[in-house]
């Protein structure tokens, strides 16, 4: 239950920020957020990361929907037993759902955070959730999964089968 609340809160935050930006900043407009560091730039993104799948919004929507279901089941079925692992998956789920809502309803994703001190893509709250959750899930799996969940490694299982 707390993971559903966390996911819902993050999706709500993502949608609120997107609403505020799209209703208060003209398309392509800029508003300083942290002067000389980050500005809000209203951008309508029709592609995936690194301009992949341009002109295939339906495919991005389908992929987002499938991933949302898979991640939801993984959290619900406790793919990671430890709360840290489930929180990581919940972050990725919230990000997937946040961007899925935009793609399904508008055909594009509203992006707004523009980092000024380096050449980087404009992104949104959902993207932050996906990246932070994905990194956390990888760190958890690589460094803590076996220790915290008490499961043997793939190599141990393979050796036992011989």
PLM region spans:
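Alpha-helical transmembrane bundles and membrane-interface segments of multipass inner-membrane proteins
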Residues: 1-162
